[in-house]
């Protein structure tokens, strides 16, 4: 059973001595923002997703009321852009392109690293009323490693073994990862991993697949530009945490959706055995031990279900069984999905677990976080998250 931290545990952590004083730190090319620029940042948003590369967005005041001119874009001259003056530095501070940006969010004295990114978009707004505002967006530096999409599958391998496999995969005559990039793993974490019966890369960029694989394990995928390495393993910069959240006790809102229409009684995978030249037919149903174990307390809510048959490119009975099991488990994970809001928790990230309490036996329990949005602004620091029910306890949760 995973360990869960309550908000009380978090509040008494000595490193969070100012738990109620949220803040952020942004370093551009290794240098912190000047104090005047910090005051102009009206809102900071960080987002991550198990299926997407993470990034951030800044909302910045772009108006100097004293000079009656735009600060960062909109009042510059050609001469301003060509010099090394203080004005030039401000006008080019958020320019998209080659600049790196490191964002950390948290509470005074204990900021958590969220992302190392590059600026991708600078979007000024000159409204009909009110002062000009600038929106700046940045994406994880992993985005630069998107080259070509591939399809493939792995059976009975650990996550770290699959990740290391990308060091030898080739797309034609070229390495799949842009040379000289390599994947490195954490040997200690790898030794404790269990094999995954089946996982597929479906017309995805390699870096997107690796990121999804990492999040599914509670890991991160971090790029070291200097060493040209992709680190696959537990976070080296901050530790994602599994939280226990109760409605009215830190959990500000929670909106679950219980959907049973897409649940199947069983799935039959059909393929072709090339060696025996005979058809393959493998069926997995709700009575399979692994399927019964996941969200078993909810299966009684599902009405009479249909049996489904799918034709897939499988060439052994074992592979067909793994594909069928993966399909049934994926369906079970979608019985309950939800959107929640809590106080700002920088360690609550996509790929972690939350234990939701106080909403009844059918809905209380363990959820897997698929997406988070961290917003720090005038209203304080709020974390919103999307999640799906993934209880493995063999029964319903307590309320």
Language-model region placement:
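Assembly/oligomerization scaffold segments
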Residues: 1-145
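Surface-exposed, non-catalytic interaction/assembly patches
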Residues: 2, 34, 71, 146-155, ...
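Short, compositionally biased
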Residues: 117-125, 236-238, 367-378
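A structural signal for the main folded, soluble domain(s) of proteins
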Residues: 101-102, 124, 166, 257, ...
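An acidic/polar, Gly/Ser/Thr-rich interaction patch typically located in mid-to-C-terminal regions
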Residues: 46, 51-89, 250-399
């Amino acid at each position: 059973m995973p360990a869960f931290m309550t908000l009380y545990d978090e509040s008494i952590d000595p490193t969070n001595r100012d738990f109620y004083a949220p803040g952020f730190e942004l370093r551009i090319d290794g240098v912190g923002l000047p104090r005047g620029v910090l005051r102009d940042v009206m809102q900071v948003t960080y987002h991550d997703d198990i299926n997407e590369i993470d990034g951030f967005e800044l909302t910045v005041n772009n108006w100097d009321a004293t000079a009656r001119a735009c600060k960062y874009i909109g009042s510059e001259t050609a001469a301003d852009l060509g010099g090394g003056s203080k004005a030039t530095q401000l006008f080019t501070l958020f320019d998209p392109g080659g600049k790196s940006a490191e964002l950390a969010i948290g509470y005074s004295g204990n900021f958590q690293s969220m992302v190392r990114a590059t600026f991708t978009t600078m979007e000024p707004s000159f409204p009909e009323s009110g002062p000009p505002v600038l929106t700046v967006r940045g994406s994880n530096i992993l985005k630069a490693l998107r080259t070509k999409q591939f399809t493939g599958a792995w059976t009975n391998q650990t996550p770290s073994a699959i990740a290391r496999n990308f060091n030898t995969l080739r797309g034609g005559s070229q390495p799949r990862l842009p040379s000289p990039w390599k994947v490195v793993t954490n040997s200690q974490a790898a030794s404790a991993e269990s094999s995954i019966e089946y996982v597929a890369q479906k017309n995805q960029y390699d870096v997107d697949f690796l990121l999804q694989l990492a999040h599914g394990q509670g890991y991160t995928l971090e790029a070291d530009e200097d060493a040209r390495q992709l680190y696959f393993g537990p976070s080296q910069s901050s530790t994602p945490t599994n939280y226990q959240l109760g409605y009215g006790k830190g959990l500000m809102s929670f909106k679950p959706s219980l959907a049973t229409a897409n649940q199947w009684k069983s799935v039959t995978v059909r393929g072709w055995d090339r060696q025996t030249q005979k058809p393959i037919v493998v069926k997995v149903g709700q009575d399979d031990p692994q399927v019964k174990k996941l969200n078993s307390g909810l299966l009684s809510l599902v009405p009479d279900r249909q049996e489904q048959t799918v034709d897939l490119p499988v060439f052994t009975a074992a592979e067909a069984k793994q594909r069928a099991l993966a399909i049934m488990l994926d369906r079970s994970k979608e019985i309950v999905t939800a959107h929640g809001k809590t106080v700002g928790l920088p360690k609550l990230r996509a790929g972690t677990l939350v234990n939701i309490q106080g909403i009844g036996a059918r809905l209380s329990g363990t959820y897997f976080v698929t997406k988070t949005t961290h917003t720090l602004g005038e209203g304080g620091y709020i974390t919103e998250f999307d999640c799906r029910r993934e209880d493995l306890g063999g029964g319903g949760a307590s309320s």
